[in-house]
Amino acid sequence: IIGEALKRLHKFMGYDTIGDIHLGDWGLQMGLIIAELQVRQPELCYFDPNYTGEYPKEAPFTLSELEEIYPTASLKKKEDPEFAEKAHIATFELQQGRAGYRAIWNHIMRISLADLHRIYDALDVHYEAWLGESDADPYIPAMIEDLKAKGHAVMSEGALVFPVAEEGDKKEIPPCILIKSDGAAIYATTDLATIVQRMQDHDPDKMLYVTDKRQNLHFEQVFRAAHKSGIVKAETELEHVGHGTMNGKDGKPFKTREGGVMRLERLIAEMTDFVRAKVVENQIVAESA
């Protein structure tokens, strides 16, 4: 909603604006779902490396099941190092093109996108581009080679990193990790590749990133890397618009009674019911006064 408001304001001021949802569809969250699904249904053809037939058109899970699988897997990752390792391997193999995992990914995306379209339409939020991390993936190899050739990408403790610290920094700015020691690309890698893609497709004067303010350091690293490497022009503006979180009584991001993150749809429904009850209550008070 904040991004939609900023887009409309810039459009009113004369900018040609493009809203991009930038789906997080290529990272560890996908590996977690794949790993948890394999625990629950190991007999599925997606997990047979020797399978050569067509994969089912129908997903082996529903939206409600998918919404339960991910938080379960996310919690298990913190408690079970062996499961966490399997999720990392699944993420890497998905990114490398393993057919069965790509088929699961297609199921996840089809179900998730249908739900997202429905929710955003209800909020009157509209994106001109429905791209994600997966769309930036083809740009990564050439980008990495270019960063190596220019001396920006260096090896450190088995990982490929881009040092972005500057003299005068008042706080430590760690290197931007490009490729982890296990060979997997991460959030920063795809964010940089997305900037490459956007510069080639649109050459924008300004890019606004509207996310949780807890990602401030991440975007500081990515934006510095983009400018230092020449991925963007010196005059191209990169800005992180960090917003707060809705917190519970403990001061931490609000969760449901079950301990998971509340879905936006459920939050809107609860807020609507609360306001409706208050309106009725105020009407009763006014009529009895």
Positions of the model-derived regions?
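NTP-dependent nucleotidyl-transfer catalytic core
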Residues: I1-A289
